Amino acid sequence: MNIMEEMNELLKAPIPIYSGLSGVEVKAIIKEAKLLISSRFHGVVSGLSQGVPTLCTSWSHKYVELMRDYQCEACLLDSLDGTKGVSVIDDALLNPQKYTPSKESIQHIEQKVREMWDTLL
């Protein structure tokens, strides 16, 4: 039994555990999430770009900059302060709109990406 299965057994309401999925399948699952908590850069980008309330741990400056781009600086979890992290997660579940990137910030990032590709191609 792996650590995810062990942790899942401790929950009052176990959650689905997925593995072996393609990137497209993962993105589809993220889009349906009520809340995404990720420490993987592409997972965080997927959540933010799809307007999913997204929390992340920041072990690199990339995450701080990404959250700033989406105007979601409050969505960074301090991996050294578990008590505060639990409070933020609880608040995100009760008030997801506070942790959801605005449509304007998503559109702004999408426009910047289009401009980048236009320049490159």
Kindly label every feature range from the protein language model:
Residues 1-121:
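Active-site anion-handling motifs in enzyme catalytic cores
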